[in-house]
């Protein structure tokens, strides 16, 4: 998911486009108490659909979801480094608010986020 000042979007990889989920600035939900995140131009929120690994409540499914998010997080960090963009992988965020705002299913869990911006 992509959280911008004007709205929150789902990235559609097949069509390489963003689909608006909700209008409005929800960077505060991503911030998890860290004010700098509210000023980042964009935040990428990594969601894992644990039902893809079987029982969404099982420890194994949760581990697999966390591992997938970690792999994607590393790729985001590597790309940002190559593109001279600033980012930091974070796990603190308002999970319950993000679940509502992004209209997530019960099996979908916010795992990590990456605020992305320019170096100061």
Task: Please provide the spans of the model-predicted regions.
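Acidic, surface-exposed loops and disordered segments
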Residues: 1-120
């Amino acid at each position: 998911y992509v959280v911008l000042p004007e709205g929150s979007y789902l990235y559609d990889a097949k069509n390489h486009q963003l689909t608006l989920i909700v209008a409005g600035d929800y960077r505060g939900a991503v911030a998890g108490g860290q004010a700098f995140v509210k000023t980042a131009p964009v935040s990428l929120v990594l969601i894992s659909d644990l039902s893809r690994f079987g029982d969404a409540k099982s420890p194994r499914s949760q581990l697999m979801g966390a591992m997938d998010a970690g792999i994607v997080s590393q790729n985001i960090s590597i790309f940002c480094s190559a593109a001279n963009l600033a980012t930091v992988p974070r796990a603190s965020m308002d999970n319950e608010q993000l679940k509502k705002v992004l209209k997530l299913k019960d099996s979908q869990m916010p795992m990590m986020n990456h605020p992305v911006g320019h170096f100061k």
